[in-house]
């Protein structure tokens, strides 16, 4: 029995409103030429107005660029009223798209969101499952995507508990999953096997982030302490720590190797964390495009 060809998709983030949109608009126009299956747009917890950042950028990608889009919605600092308002804003985008007949169902990546030190969370959405259930009740026409963590959520006591919580997300209404970035494919495959044993049978898209410079690597090591770094990856960071050009080349090559291996092992999709860098997306696309089918998810 033949398997469906995997998808290649991108993640971008809205720029700080004080910086302006020129750079992200230019990057997205370049990314459009790569025909991604979809683009996801992140949202910041309690930092910028979601309507003025995530919703606006989602609107541009779907209406102006005609690319299927997933809007991130972290809810730990939102009330039910604010989430309902955001869903209504996204509905307006969906209505416009329906008129233009460009893309299909509006999708949301439902997240709890990161805890901000010294900022008190709201009480309506303690977990992503709470948000998923609320969306299904209030706006069931939205397709919901969930986040998952091949090496365990930082707040989970162990992977068994983490996968049990993930099963609750899927049962609540997630139709697919996107992983946190990882550098060890074997850990991803082990995670997939455990998900299958737990009865999680939705597509899992593998999150891949090419490491392009030393500062990016240092930030990653600080913020993603749960991620295992294979010996081969550590060797790249050590050998080219003071050679930016070689580090970028080796980081891109490592990501390409990961993707080729994932596709060979029948991954459902690869979700590329672009950091708004169109050149990164172009390089990955050029090296791997023959492996992917460029039909949008809908």
What residue spans do the PLM features occupy?
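Glycine-rich, proline-tolerant flexible connector loops at the mouths of alpha/beta enzymes
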Residues: 35-57, 113-125, 174-188, 194, ...
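Active-site mouth loops of central-metabolism enzymes
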Residues: 7-23, 69-82, 88, 145-161, ...
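Active-site beta-loop-alpha junctions enriched in small/polar residues
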Residues: 12-15, 42-46, 72-78, 113-115, ...
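Active-site pocket-lining/capping segments in soluble small-molecule metabolic enzymes
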Residues: 19, 123-149, 155, 197-257, ...
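Glycine-rich anion/phosphate-binding loops
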Residues: 75-99, 122-126
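Conserved, mostly hydrophobic/aromatic
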Residues: 11, 39, 100, 169, ...
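Glycine-rich, positively charged N-terminal anion/phosphate-binding segment
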Residues: 21-29, 47-65
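Conserved N-terminal beta1-alpha1 strand-loop-helix module at the mouth
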Residues: 1-41
